[in-house]
From Swiss-Prot:
The gene is proA. Pathway: Amino-acid biosynthesis; L-proline biosynthesis; L-glutamate 5-semialdehyde from L-glutamate: step 2/2. It comes from Chlorobaculum tepidum (strain ATCC 49652 / DSM 12025 / NBRC 103806 / TLS) (Chlorobium tepidum). Belongs to the gamma-glutamyl phosphate reductase family. This is Gamma-glutamyl phosphate reductase. It is found in: Cytoplasm. Disulfide bonds: none annotated. Catalyzes the NADPH-dependent reduction of L-glutamate 5-phosphate into L-glutamate 5-semialdehyde and phosphate. The product spontaneously undergoes cyclization to form 1-pyrroline-5-carboxylate. The lineage of its organism: Bacteria, Pseudomonadati, Chlorobiota, Chlorobiia, Chlorobiales.
Length: 420
């Protein structure tokens, strides 16, 4: 049997396992997740040793290093997250809509699982736990394609998950970790009939790869080219704090600030807006007006003149660009040209300007006078998320349990037949 044939055979097993999840009651699903959380401490040494092998192959200066890193504190946090998912209300079998037709037919629209969800992701072994928990809670089976840089970690984690599933008398094929090789991704992306949807989580390059090569439906998540516009009516102290938070809180995540847009009438305030970033060694790529305003007031080694490509980059690190504009319209045009439609923000006190920005910006989350760091399922009160959808079909914004479900119509009659 070739590797391709072996993978397809395993995908068939996952599809079969997905049908066994549907009749499981809520107590069974929640009990599995809680036991998995309880078993993490005993498995920690094996998981951390596997993670150490992955880390040894990566330069600590690589922006992906922090995302790859697991430690005791992060494992404890993962266990807490698993318990939190278990405590969430089930999204399954909810009556979303119901009506009785004039002919007496009774219709109910009820929530159901998507089926088998394929996840492609990079450098984040915690995602392995997160995705399994969310997929199981929403009644879905999971096929994972992690990056080769997290191969050892992912194997150790999936081994633990499958052990817990097996120990509870359930089918361990409800989760499957594909080989780390790139060819496995191509098989997954074209597994029509076995995979119901693909969700890529990672860089824009990864998302583009999935969209280009997949014959399975794809929900795009993750990539964020995030802007914050400081308007001529913006409060300076508020702007300083928001910019600092949006850029430095967690620079490697998709809701981190990439480009600060500043109204030219506030160019003299630019040093106050960004000087606090110096303490975090944030590198700034500034257009000409911003560059000369910051020259001598921001460290020379952290300040460069921007080139065009800096305004379409998701930095995922302690880097950002600055663009000056002469009007709200110019700011909106810049965002429309470069945005990935993830998260965009305005800092302003003029309500007319705020309303125009909120109405005209096309993004999954649009903010006024707050940090884009809040684009997160838990922060939105939705519970854990599987990603941030940047498209408009099926789901948009944080994809929590409800977004991992579809629906079907249940139609009950008393012998009616259609005559027209």
């Amino acid at each position: 049997m070739t590797e391709h044939e072996a993978i397809v055979k395993q995908l068939q097993a996952v599809q079969n396992a997905s049908r066994k999840i549907v009749p499981l009651n809520e107590e069974t699903i929640n009990g599995l997740l809680v036991e998995l959380a309880d078993r993490i401490p005993a498995a920690a040494d094996a998981i951390l040793e596997a993670n150490r092998k992955d880390l040894e192959r990566m330069d600590p200066a690589d922006p992906r290093y922090d995302r790859l890193l697991l430690n005791e504190a992060r494992l404890n946090s993962i266990a807490t997250d698993l318990r939190n998912v278990a405590a969430l209300p089930s999204p399954l079998h909810r009556v979303l809509e119901e009506r009785t037709l004039p002919n007496g037919l009774e219709l109910k629209k009820v929530s159901v699982p998507l089926g088998v969800i394929g996840i492609i992701y990079e450098s984040r072994p915690n995602v392995t736990f997160d995705v399994f928990a969310l997929c199981l809670k929403s009644g879905n089976a999971t096929v994972l394609k992690g990056g080769s840089d997290a191969a050892y970690s992912n194997i150790a984690i999936v081994n633990l998950i499958q052990t817990v599933i097996r120990d509870r008398g359930l089918d361990p094929d409800m989760i499957y970790l594909l080989p780390a090789e790139r060819e496995a991704a191509h098989i997954l992306l074209n597994a029509v009939g076995y995979i119901d949807v693909i969700i890529p989580r990672g860089s824009q390059a990864l998302i583009d790869f999935a969209r280009k090569h997949s014959t399975v439906p794809v929900i795009e998540t993750g990539a964020g080219i995030v802007h914050t516009y400081f308007d001529q009516s913006g409060d300076l102290a508020m702007g300083r704090d928001i910019v600092f938070n949006a850029k430095t809180r967690r620079p490697s995540v998709c809701n981190a600030l990439d480009t600060l847009i500043v109204h030219e009438s506030r160019i003299d305030d630019l040093p106050v807006l960004v000087v606090p970033l110096e303490e975090k060694n944030v590198q700034i790529f500034a257009d000409e007006p911003a560059y000369y305003k910051l020259l001598g007031r921001y460290p020379d080694e952290l300040l460069e003149m921007a080139s065009p490509e800096h305004f379409g980059t998701e930095f995922l690190s302690l880097k950002m660009s600055i663009k000056t504009v002469g009007s709200l319209e110019e700011a909106l045009n810049h965002i429309a040209r470069h945005s990935s439609k993830h998260s965009e923000a305005i800092i302003a006190s003029d309500q007319t300007t705020i309303d125009a920005f909120m109405k005209q910006v096309d993004a999954a989350a649009v903010y006024a006078n707050t940090s884009t760091a809040f684009t997160d399922g838990a922060q939105f009160g939705l519970g854990a998320e599987i990603g941030i959808s940047t498209q408009k079909l099926h789901a948009r914004g944080p994809m929590a349990l409800k977004e991992l479900c579809s629906y079907k119509w249940l139609v009950t009659g008393q012998g009616q037949v259609r005559t027209a």
